[in-house]
């Protein structure tokens, strides 16, 4: 995988896509998409790209009743050999329970072309309060293709700052069967800002001692830059 070339392509798309998107009527379209460039694809505190940059892209169709389906892709690097990328498929349902509470549930299929033994499903439920606070619960009965039950719990909050910046916090914990792995904690604190269809964030992420013992340098604390364009 040529991470530098992929990231350069993503950054070009970030700069040019808003001009193409301006001709579209976002409000009338059930389709949404995003293209992202990241300095490191970090998932639950652990690098999925061997601490290198990559590009990501997603596409979603949402029905008038809140049912949605789509796909998402990212480069990955787990060492020598396959896979070179992750391709996820998902279907879900999103609904506003009232004026301040939103509920979302989805089934995500993680796939790794060329390394199908890593494929697995995960059920993810997220409740958002007042748009700025959320709680996420996730469960897989075959985490990482290991035939192991795994749970994930995450809480996140965002606080508005001057000039439309946002201060973002997140803390999560992964729970595994004892014979598979120790449980570990991950966290993130960062600043983000949207510029119309383009958004940017800079976050400092890490894990606790258990996470570092399990994943080594891939779980070391680091700064992650994300640039995203989407409609």
Task: Report each predicted region and the residues it spans.
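Outer-membrane beta-barrel proteins
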Residues: 19-25, 63-66, 94-99, 129-131, ...
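Outer-membrane beta-barrel architecture
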Residues: 58-60, 90-93, 106, 124-128, ...
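Repeated loop/turn-to-beta-strand initiation elements of outer-membrane beta-barrel proteins
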Residues: 31, 65-71, 99-105, 131-137, ...
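Cleavable N-terminal export/targeting peptides
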Residues: 1-30
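Short glycine/proline- and aromatic-enriched beta-strand/turn motifs that initiate or cap beta-hairpins
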Residues: 24-77
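Transmembrane beta-strands of outer-membrane beta-barrel pores
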Residues: 37-43, 73-77, 95, 109-113, ...
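Residues that define the transmembrane beta-barrel architecture of outer-membrane proteins
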Residues: 29, 51-55, 83-87, 117-123, ...
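Outer-membrane beta-barrel "beta-signal"
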Residues: 159, 189-198, 204-206, 217-231
């Amino acid at each position: 995988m040529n991470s530098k070339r992929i990231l350069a392509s993503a950054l070009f798309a970030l700069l040019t896509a808003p001009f193409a998107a301006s001709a579209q009527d976002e409000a009338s379209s059930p389709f949404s998409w995003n293209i992202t460039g990241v300095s490191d694809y970090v998932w639950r505190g652990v690098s999925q790209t061997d601490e290198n940059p990559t590009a990501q892209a997603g596409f979603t169709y949402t029905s008038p009743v809140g049912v949605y389906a789509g796909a998402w892709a990212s480069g990955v690097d787990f060492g020598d050999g396959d896979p070179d990328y992750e391709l996820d498929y998902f279907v879900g349902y999103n609904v506003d329970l009232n004026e301040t509470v939103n509920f979302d549930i989805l089934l995500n299929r993680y796939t790794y072309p060329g390394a199908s033994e890593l494929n697995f499903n995960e059920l993810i439920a997220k409740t958002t309060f007042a748009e700025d606070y959320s709680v996420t619960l996730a469960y897989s009965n075959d985490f990482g293709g290991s035939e192991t039950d795994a749970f994930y719990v995450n809480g996140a909050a965002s606080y508005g700052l001057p000039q439309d910046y946002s201060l973002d916090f997140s803390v999560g914990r992964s729970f595994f069967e004892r014979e598979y792995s120790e449980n570990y904690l991950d966290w993130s604190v960062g600043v983000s800002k949207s510029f119309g269809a383009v958004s940017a964030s800079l976050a400092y992420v890490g894990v606790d001692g258990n996470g570092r013992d399990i994943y080594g340098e891939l779980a070391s604390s680091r700064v992650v830059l994300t640039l995203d364009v989407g409609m």
